[in-house]
UniProtKB/Swiss-Prot annotation:
Species assigned in the record: Bradyrhizobium sp. (strain BTAi1 / ATCC BAA-1182)
Gene responsible for this protein: atpB1
Domain of life: Bacteria
An annotated GO cellular component: proton-transporting ATP synthase complex
Membrane topology: Multi-pass membrane protein
Pfam family, one: ATP-synt_A
Location relative to the cell: Cell inner membrane
Name the record gives this protein: ATP synthase subunit a 1
Length: 247
C-alpha cells in the first residue's frame, strides 16, 4: 500500500539562507502557503466593485458578510476592529484546505507548526490587546463572577490553565481533522489502485472503495469549510475576552 503519510513530508526546494547553523529553507509547505495568498489576492482583485456583482465579487462579498456577522455576533461591534485579522485567517485556512484536496498538492494545515503559529498569533493578540485596552482589569478574565469564595481559588487555577492551553487546543483541532481526513482519503485511493491492478475482478471490487473515495472527497470539501469556520469562531470568542474580560 502507498504510504498515506508521505503526502505530508516537507521537501526542500531551495535554501534561503542560514541563521547560525540553522538552515532556512523554502519548502513545498512555503510554496503552497504563498499559493494560497496569491489565490486570495487574485480573487480580491478579480472581484472588483461593480454595482451588479459578478461571480468573484459575489463570492468575496458573501465571505466578507459571513465573517463580519460571525465577528459581530461573537465579539460585538467593537470586535470589528479585528476584522482584517479574522477575515485573513478564515480565507487563508479555507483556501489552503481547498487547495490541499486537489491530488498531488500539499495541505499546509495538516502540519501542527502551521496551525500552532496561527493559533499563537491569535493568543498573543488577545493578551496584548487585552492589557492595552483594560490594563490590570484584564485579569478579570480569570475570575468568573458569581463563583462562591470557597471554590474561587480552584476555579481561578482552572481558568488560567484553560487560557494558556488555548493555542494547543486551537491548533490541534484544525491539524488533527485535516490530517485524519487526508490519511483516510489516501488509504481508500490506495485500495482502488491495488484492486484495479488485479484484473477484471479487481476492477469490479475497486468500485466500492472508489465510491467511498468520491464520497469522502465531498465530505472533505465540507470539512475544509467547517474547520476554517471553527477556527474563526474560536478566534472571535477569544478576542471577545480581550475586549470584555469581565463578561
Amino acid at each position: 500500500m502507498i504510504d498515506p503519510i508521505h503526502q505530508f513530508h516537507l521537501n526542500k526546494i531551495f535554501t534561503i539562507g542560514h541563521i547560525g547553523n540553522q538552515e532556512i529553507a523554502f519548502t513545498n509547505s512555503t510554496a503552497y502557503m504563498l499559493l494560497a495568498v496569491v489565490l486570495i489576492a487574485g480573487m480580491m482583485l478579480a472581484a472588483g466593485r461593480a454595482l451588479v456583482p459578478g461571480r468573484f465579487q459575489s463570492v468575496v462579498e458573501l465571505s466578507y458578510e459571513f465573517v463580519a456577522n460571525t465577528l459581530r455576533t461573537s465579539a460585538g461591534s467593537h470586535g470589528m476592529t479585528f476584522f482584517p485579522l479574522v477575515f485573513s485567517l478564515f480565507m487563508f485556512i479555507f483556501v489552503s484546505n481547498i487547495v490541499g484536496i486537489i491530488p498531488y498538492t500539499f495541505t499546509v494545515s495538516s502540519h501542527i507548526i502551521v496551525t500552532f503559529s496561527l493559533a499563537l498569533l491569535v493568543f498573543l493578540t488577545v493578551i496584548i490587546y487585552g492589557f492595552y485596552k483594560n490594563g490590570l482589569k484584564f485579569f478579570k478574565l480569570f475570575v468568573p463572577s458569581g463563583i462562591p469564595a470557597v471554590i474561587l481559588p480552584l476555579v481561578v487555577v482552572i481558568e488560567i490553565i484553560s487560557f494558556f492551553s488555548r493555542p494547543i487546543s486551537h491548533s490541534v483541532r484544525l491539524f488533527a481533522n485535516m490530517l485524519a481526513g487526508h490519511v483516510t482519503l489516501k488509504v481508500f485511493a490506495s485500495f482502488v489502485t491495488m484492486l484495479g491492478a488485479l484484473g477484471f475482478v479487481g476492477k469490479v471490487g475497486a468500485l466500492l472503495p472508489l465510491g467511498l473515495t468520491v464520497a469522502l472527497t465531498g465530505l472533505e470539501l465540507m470539512v475544509a469549510f467547517l474547520q476554517a469556520y471553527v477556527f474563526t469562531i474560536l478566534t472571535c470568542i477569544y478576542l471577545n475576552d480581550a475586549i470584555h474580560p469581565g463578561h
